[in-house]
Amino acid sequence: MATELPYDLTPELAPLSWLIGSWEGQGRLGDGSAGTEIFYQRVDFTEHGLPFVEYRAESWLCEADGTLLRPLTVESGFWQVDRARRDGDVGPGMRPADIVPAFRSAEDVEGLRAGDQGFGLTATITHPGSLSELYYGRIKGPQLQLATDAILRGSAAGPYHR
């Protein structure tokens, strides 16, 4: 099925466009075996006219029928096509991007494709309790793979288990 892109979507977000919106579902904590607690998660991907999507996920413990019991956690971050920084990019900090995006067309973005491997992907995710993660991976059509590259742990963070 073809994905219809909004006419005003930043071209660089085309590979991520199918993620934009809300996703939700249930799973099991730990190794996922029977008897482990069930959780519900809602994930939102939002675009703001910049070359990244904002990510936010909220999780709750729940009953098998979906009745929410209590909040588990919240995490947030940013996902983008992995590429070298250009002079016209936003940041660091509040420094605005150039009015003309670094990649102006689908043809420009296609230059970032790694052959049949799709596009490189970077995700930064921050958790409560002074923990941040950096992921690298690939996005190819409606499939993505991510692997943890780096962890930043503050004094309030507990041990990290991949």
Label for each model-derived stretch:
Residues A2-Y7, L13-R162:
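Soluble ligand-binding/transfer domains with enclosed cavities or grooves
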